[in-house]
């Protein structure tokens, strides 16, 4: 998923040797928990920033919800057709997909703000900063230490 790709980016961008090992050997795997633990230990102010944004809670909830659907733990949530002849778009399913995608995008946005965003913040244009901070309350922006200028 885009969220997993984003998680891996935040880790492997500074771990090229581990990435090379992963390419050579499928036995080497870094999971979501290991990446979050890495950020807690090594990304400056990650704990404070993720708490301000509710990142880990939202990430775990999104991951659990999507996993439940993917692994069939919510039967009927995505499939309402009884035969191929009746396959057609279903409004309720589309809403679930769109809402899940939007939440995943928001979680990824917050992940980037807590990790690589802070590192590269001074290189972003004023317009980019405005877009990245859109919708965040002033007190949260202050806690994150991310200016709009």
Regions found by a protein language model. Name each.
Residues 4-149:
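A cross-kingdom marker of C-terminal helix-rich interaction/assembly modules
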